[in-house]
Every structure is written in structure tokens, then in C-alpha cells.
């Protein structure tokens, strides 16, 4: 297994430790784990492209690894009342629609590349989570900023999902 793939696997392995730290109210540890895991997301793709180490494993496993990390944090925020549950349902619905469309396209031999709006959505979600971890814990003054970034990520989630469906509507006739 090459280094980028190891980083992707590491990100997935870190999720239960992040959840445990957050639930134990070890917010600094949860914060550090989430930041490290988020950095592995940035590094795995850069290393894979720079060193010509792009693999099917990486292409397939990187997006779910990101989602497992971010959505586990969002579930924790719903559980403690930081964000409303309906927002998580919108986010998950977008992911199911996009993933379903990608699966149908792939079954026809078509690869649909990730759009910039989807990448922006992911970055906004990660930034919101990072701020909200600290806001729920030691620095509650950051909650307003964290929630503003979260709402921006929700808008980008809806926008990127809509853009994806409209650009790839031919998938519905496959």
C-alpha cells in the first residue's frame, strides 16, 4: 500500500478516536485529531499526484473517508444540539443523490469528476467542524463564527448538489 492510500486509511482509523475524545469532552484532543485527519485529506491527493501514485483504491476510498470524518462530527453536533438535525438530513440526502448518480454513471463506464463547488463545500464543512469543536468546548465565544461557516457550508451543499444534478442529468436516462 502506498503512502497516499495509507493516509486515507489513517483518516478512517482516526474517526473512532476523534468521536471518543469528543464524547469524553477532551475537546483539545478531538480538535487535534480532526485537524490531523483533515490534513491527511489534503496530503494524500497532493502526494499521489506529485509522485504518480494515483490508484483506484485512492480514487474510490478518499471521498468516503472525508465523509466519515466530517459527518461523524456533524452527528455529534446534532446529538448535543449544536446544529439542527434537519441540516444533517439535507447534507446526507445530497451525498446519497450524488453517490447514486456516480454509481450509475460508473456502471456505464463514465467517470464524473468532482466539481470545484463540491470541494469548497468540503472545506467549509471541515472549517465549521474545527471551529465548532472549540466553541462547544473551551471557547464558546466562537460559536457564532462556527455557525456562520456551518450555514455557508449548508448553502454550498445545496448549491453543489443542484449543480451536480443539473450538469449530469443524463445519468437519469441511463
Where are these regions (language model features)?
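Alpha-helical transmembrane bundles and membrane-interface segments of multipass inner-membrane proteins
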Residues: 1-174
